[in-house]
Amino acid sequence: MRRGAIGIGTLIVFIAMVLVAAVAAGVLISTSGYLQQKAMSAGRQTTQEVASGIKVLNVYGYINGSTPGAHNITRLVLYVSPNAGSGGIDLAHVKVVISDGKRMAVYRYYDPNEDKNSDIQPAYIHYTGDIANVFAYEKWEPYYKGKYPTGFDPNNKFYITDNIDISAVWWNLYSAYNKTSNNDKDYGKLLFGIAVVQDGDESLDSENHPSLSWGDIAAIMLWTFPFDDNNNPIDGFGLPPSTKVTGKVIPENGAGGVIDFTTPSTYTDNILELQ
């Protein structure tokens, strides 16, 4: 009888140990599964963060005038594309930072919150179509106040709003920064324009949210207004020869594209490949 009681007691202890082990195993399996999912999620996030981003393919500069050596670089075009494996990049949330060592300028695209009281619209600085000359604008090059496109009436409007082409984008960017308007909300806006170069899925077609996806190429168009020794663009501005320029094209998420070049010691052509 005593042996039977001992045997039953041992069996109860054994069953209890098995149950405890089963519960512990269940907890371990559940915990390991949770940790595995967290690790995979973190890995995906890290991979996306590393892979996502924008790259600068080339940077070109433009010097106005028949004798380029007598002038500065007044306009830049940056050709950008997403990194391999990157998700979509909304250029409306991209910032372009450029420094010449003396000053640092931050360019942006149209912002509906910032520009809601302005006459500027995203359609005025966004171009889709064939590009015969990305710097097409020289006949209007406004180095002094009061120079307007042929047939343009500054008393009625200050932006080109119809039949937007490359020249119109340059003009509208110029007008947004310089006081060519009676609307004080349309002054000092340091914007960049966008020209669609390659867009297989039409993700860049949206003027409000032009987005870079795999294989897309966009041209970011900007004036070098801030690089002016007397803060008066009307009498000349831009990047002079032998200037070290650094900066970044910064997306909302992911790695930024690097801008790093030195302007030539002399300017011999109107269009220069800088990077």
UniProtKB/Swiss-Prot annotation:
For this protein, the record's InterPro entries field holds: Flagellin/pilin_N_arc, Flagellin_arc
Chain positions listed as propeptide in the UniProt record:
1-4
**Could you name the Gene Ontology cellular component terms for this entry?**
archaeal-type flagellum
Q: Which UniProt keywords apply?
A: Archaeal flagellum
Q: Name one GO molecular function term.
A: structural molecule activity
| Record bears the keyword Zinc-finger | no
Q: Give any single GO term for biological process.
A: archaeal or bacterial-type flagellum-dependent cell motility
Compartmental location: Archaeal flagellum
Family statement drawn from the similarity comment of this UniProt entry:
Belongs to the archaeal flagellin family.
Role: Flagellin is the subunit protein which polymerizes to form the filaments of archaeal flagella.
Please report the name of this protein according to its UniProt entry.
Flagellin B5
| Organism of this sequence | Thermococcus kodakarensis (strain ATCC BAA-918 / JCM 12380 / KOD1)
Record lineage: Archaea, Methanobacteriati, Methanobacteriota, Thermococci, Thermococcales
Q: Which gene encodes it?
A: flaB5
